[in-house]
């Protein structure tokens, strides 16, 4: 199976406005640093590797190159600032739904930002408010072999490969995630919970 996050692999699968424009980089310190303030809502950057990826509360996000879905999405929600923390849960639920749809697994949400399979973390979400925008970072352990899961958290982390026994197409997962996230985001903007 060819597993790529290249524009050629991702863009034909996009159905909505999220992921447009789409930028891919092979390696970066963190995708959270790559979206400029002037980027439009829906702009997305994805990478095969993050050398300084981080999660909520400054925790490190570690993943071998080419095995995970690592991306950041620009949002410009016109809502009260008090509602912005809700975006973390909106994105985590969309991630959970995409994983379930593509794998048949039954992931659960560990409030506010982690997606678990069993008792082990498979994905995380980080929402950072910056001026008039929110940069939403999402990391999913997709094709990480069991022996390459980070040693310091090997009892707490898993991957979709470990849980399903098969490699998954990261571009398909990204497209499924963006479709669900756009739908949930629009409902959230309109006041639905």
What are these regions (language model features)?
Residues 2, 81-106, 117-193:
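Long, positively charged amphipathic alpha-helical accessory segments at protein N-termini or as interdomain linkers
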Residues 21, 106-108:
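Residues at or immediately flanking beta-strands
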Residues 26, 109-111:
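Short loop/edge segments at beta-strand edges and connector loops
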Residues 32, 56, 110, 120-122:
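Short beta-strand-initiation
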């Amino acid at each position: 199976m060819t597993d790529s996050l290249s524009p050629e692999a991702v863009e034909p699968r996009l159905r909505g406005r999220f992921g447009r424009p789409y930028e891919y980089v092979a390696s970066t310190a963190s995708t959270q640093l790559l979206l400029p303030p002037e980027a439009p809502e829906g702009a997305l950057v994805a990478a095969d590797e993050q050398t300084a990826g981080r999660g909520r509360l400054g925790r490190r996000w570690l993943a071998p190159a080419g095995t995970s879905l690592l991306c950041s999405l620009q949002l410009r929600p016109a809502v009260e600032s008090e509602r912005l923390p809700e975006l973390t849960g909106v994105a985590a639920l969309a991630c959970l739904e995409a994983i379930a749809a593509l794998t048949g697994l039954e992931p659960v949400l560990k409030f506010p930002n982690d997606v678990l399979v069993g008792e082990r973390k498979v994905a995380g979400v980080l929402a950072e408010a910056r001026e008039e925008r929110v940069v939403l970072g999402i990391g999913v352990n997709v094709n990480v072999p069991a022996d390459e899961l980070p040693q310091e958290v090997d009892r707490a982390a898993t991957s979709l490969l470990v849980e399903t026994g098969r490699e998954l197409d990261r571009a398909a997962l990204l497209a499924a995630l963006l479709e669900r996230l756009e739908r949930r985001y629009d409902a959230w903007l309109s006041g639905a919970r």
